[in-house]
């Protein structure tokens, strides 16, 4: 379920704060969102793949923590990111 390097580089370039930025919360959330959507599609086909379901829950939890951090530190960037990714605000 890993992303190929070309797609990952495209996402990093789109959400990076500056050139070479791979660790900012915006980039991490965007990468996690892409992985979550791909894994969700996999689980719609393979309903009994419980180990992948557990991995999906871990990814969602990690994304939730990063979004909580981003909301506390930089609310403007948070609102822009969730609008661009199509994520609901709690």
Swiss-Prot record:
Which cysteines pair up through disulfides? They are: none
Q: What is the residue range of the signal peptide feature? A: none
Q: Which Pfam families match?
A: Ribosomal_S15
Q: Name one GO cellular component term.
A: cytosolic small ribosomal subunit
A single Gene Ontology molecular function, please? Answer: structural constituent of ribosome
Please give the family membership noted in the entry: Belongs to the universal ribosomal protein uS15 family.
| Protein name (record) | Small ribosomal subunit protein uS15
